Curated annotation (Swiss-Prot):
<dbReference type="GO" id="GO:0004824">
    <property type="term" value="F:lysine-tRNA ligase activity"/>
</dbReference>
<feature type="binding site">
    <location>
        <position position="300"/>
    </location>
    <ligand>
        <name>ATP</name>
    </ligand>
</feature>
<dbReference type="GO" id="GO:0016880">
    <property type="term" value="F:acid-ammonia (or amide) ligase activity"/>
</dbReference>
<comment type="similarity">
    <text>Belongs to the class-II aminoacyl-tRNA synthetase family. EpmA subfamily.</text>
</comment>
<dbReference type="InterPro" id="IPR045864">
    <property type="entry name" value="aa-tRNA-synth_II/BPL/LPL"/>
</dbReference>
<keyword id="KW-0067">ATP-binding</keyword>
<dbReference type="GO" id="GO:0006430">
    <property type="term" value="P:lysyl-tRNA aminoacylation"/>
</dbReference>
<feature type="binding site">
    <location>
        <begin position="244"/>
        <end position="245"/>
    </location>
    <ligand>
        <name>ATP</name>
    </ligand>
</feature>
<feature type="binding site">
    <location>
        <position position="109"/>
    </location>
    <ligand>
        <name>ATP</name>
    </ligand>
</feature>
<dbReference type="InterPro" id="IPR004525">
    <property type="entry name" value="EpmA"/>
</dbReference>
<feature type="binding site">
    <location>
        <begin position="76"/>
        <end position="78"/>
    </location>
    <ligand>
        <name>substrate</name>
    </ligand>
</feature>
<dbReference type="GO" id="GO:0005524">
    <property type="term" value="F:ATP binding"/>
</dbReference>
<dbReference type="GO" id="GO:0000049">
    <property type="term" value="F:tRNA binding"/>
</dbReference>
<feature type="binding site">
    <location>
        <begin position="100"/>
        <end position="102"/>
    </location>
    <ligand>
        <name>ATP</name>
    </ligand>
</feature>
<keyword id="KW-0436">Ligase</keyword>
<dbReference type="InterPro" id="IPR018149">
    <property type="entry name" value="Lys-tRNA-synth_II_C"/>
</dbReference>
<dbReference type="Pfam" id="PF00152">
    <property type="entry name" value="tRNA-synt_2"/>
</dbReference>
Length: 325
């Protein structure tokens, strides 16, 4: 294919056929388990407050709205799906487009396909088992292994992430030849994320998927804090062959605590010179009305297909990447 023929798809037709078969297999997986497929909006008047996520923004100027309404493309269907859960829909899954105004590369595209599902009355470990079942079915891989966040850091970096201070974290980063970044970084969680990305991820999930669970409580996001150890959150991620595939939570159901976390995110955004984001009041109202105890997970479908096909990059499994869109 000529590099100038940008009308052509980035992925080959045989790969797109295989992708379609995997999408059908995912739907069968959930149909066999009685999980309802749902569709939720791609746009919302509120968005995520996470300091590491950057949403696309647009403006609706249709009849009756001459002043316009700010809308955000969804970085994940999470908030709308939780509103469905609070309304009593039971276990749900969704295959949808998500959007993040961030990088483009081998493992990233600003528009991507997300698989997200929620299981009422599942704890984190039971959902991890279901994720493992799906990966074995789609990837024909070995059963996954699991490490706590603390075990992963102690094993690969010889540091305890739950007790180390910022000086110790900077010293650990310096051993990875990244002191030029760490020397000016004041946020503890950013240092931990740097260590996870550069010092842990390259060493895990090589032969089989690896779950990392019990992230620090400061990185809980929308997850519950563990009742057994208040230093950690009921949150997990799964990695395979150098790729982060999924991020899951035992979901927070306390509306007041969730609002406090959103507000704290916005304070962090302001301190970094980032725009503060509108908080999703509809989500908070749904939590207040009663979100059932549940666990949920978001999985990158394009990355899953890439692994299933042994492809080198997302461009090999997406019909049109952003540079050809």
């Amino acid at each position: 294919m000529s590099e100038t023929a940008t009308w052509q798809p980035s992925a080959s037709i045989p790969n797109l056929l295989k992708r379609a078969a995997i999408m059908a297999e995912i739907r069968r997986f959930f149909a066999d388990r009685g999980v309802l497929e749902v569709e939720t909006p791609c746009m919302s008047q509120a968005t995520v407050t996470d300091i590491h996520l950057f949403p696309f923004e647009t403006r609706f100027v249709g009849p009756g709205h001459s002043q316009g309404i700010n809308l955000y493309l969804m970085t994940s269907p999470e908030y709308h799906m939780k509103r469905l859960l609070a309304a009593g829909c039971g276990p749900v899954f969704q295959l949808c487009r998500s959007f993040r105004n961030e990088e483009m590369g081998r493992h990233h595209n600003p528009e991507f396909t997300m698989l997200e599902w929620y299981r009422p009355h599942y704890d984190m470990y039971r959902l991890m088992n279901e994720v493992d079942d799906l990966l074995q079915q789609v990837l024909d891989c070995q059963p996954a292994e699991s490490l706590s966040y603390q075990q992963a850091f102690q094993g690969h970096l010889e540091i305890d992430p739950l007790s180390a201070d910022k000086t110790q974290l900077r010293e650990a980063v310096a051993k990875l030849d990244l002191s030029n970044i760490a020397d000016t970084e004041e946020d503890r969680d950013t240092l931990l994320q740097l260590l996870l990305t550069m010092g842990v991820e390259p060493h895990i999930g090589k032969e089989k998927p690896t779950f990392i669970y019990h992230f620090p409580a400061s990185q809980a996001s929308l997850a519950q804090i563990s009742t057994e150890d208040h230093r950690v959150a009921e949150r997990f991620e799964v990695y395979y062959k150098g790729i982060e595939l999924a991020n899951g939570f035992h979901e927070l159901t306390d509306a007041r605590e969730q609002q406090q976390r959103f507000e704290q995110d916005n304070r962090k955004r302001a301190a970094r010179g980032l725009p503060q984001q509108p908080i999703d009041q509809n989500l908070l109202d749904a939590l207040a009305a009663g979100l059932p105890d549940c666990s949920g997970v978001a999985l990158g479908v394009d990355r899953l297909v890439m692994l299933a096909l042994g492809a080198e990059s997302l461009a090999d499994v997406i019909a049109f990447t952003v540079d050809r869109a």
